[in-house]
Amino acid sequence: MRASLIQIGVKDDETVEFRRQRVASLVVEAGREGSDLVVLPELWTTGAFAYESFAAEAEPLHGPTYEVMAKAASDAGVWLHAGSVPERTPSDGGSATGDGPLYNTSLLFSPSGELAATYRKIHRFGFDKGEAVLMAAGAELVTVRLPETTLGLATCYDLRFPELFRGLVDAGAETLVIPAGWPERRQSHWTLLARARAVENQAYVLACGTAGTHARVPQAGRSIVVDPWGEVLAEAGTDEEVLTVEFDPARVGTTREQFPALKDRMLGLDAPRR
């Protein structure tokens, strides 16, 4: 299976619509070069730290980014994880103005351009500010069966919560896809956690970040693909880049069979008394 991670440079002086079209052309190019799966970063239309832009640039699920990315997936003939967008939802009263809560929502399209899945980010970053107060939390784990593998979907800060990934694996995930907007100052955590999630779940990890600087926050870049044994198959630099790698989905089953650590889990034990 061939995957391309498009590490987008989010530039403050670039309009959102121009960026959509620019990214769509990169998706189509990846498809022409033989990729089966293309992955984009988190919140690439706004920038993950451009908090003041979330409300202004939020869009309904079937909004402009949906339309452009659906066409790109179809034109490219690829499975497209289109990263995430700030999704504006209808109010409880069903208002057409979409004044309900915002979500950090990932979109996955099939090679025909149909929406195959959405995932609303569960763990929001910011503690008592930023995304944590501007967006609502998702509540559902999402896996998607592709012909070659089963994807488990997560987003950025989710990477720090191993129980989410164990839940995805229990639901059948073999390839963990993680779009992100990870800052440069915590780049070492990014690499370490991506490899840890691969090792402990005996799964592939495809983690796609953003490049450059936006909202005065330098981005880590360093998109990475890790195999089920924790070996790094490919890693990007810090600039905008298309990281393409070939990987064998059957390696997940082989690894789990030859080193069946997941079968030795001892869940359900009582916590030790203090």
Question: Where are each of the predicted segments found?
Answer:
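Extreme N-terminal starter segment of soluble prokaryotic enzymes
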Residues: 1-5
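Active-site catalytic loop in hydrolytic enzyme cores
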Residues: 61, 71, 90-174, 184-192, ...
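C-terminal beta-strand edge segments of enzyme domains
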Residues: 118, 143, 210-274
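Cys-nucleophile CN-hydrolase/nitrilase-fold catalytic domain and related Cys-dependent amidase chemistry
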Residues: 13-112, 118, 183-203
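Active-site-proximal beta-strand/loop segments in catalytic clefts of secreted hydrolases
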Residues: 8, 43, 83-85, 155, ...
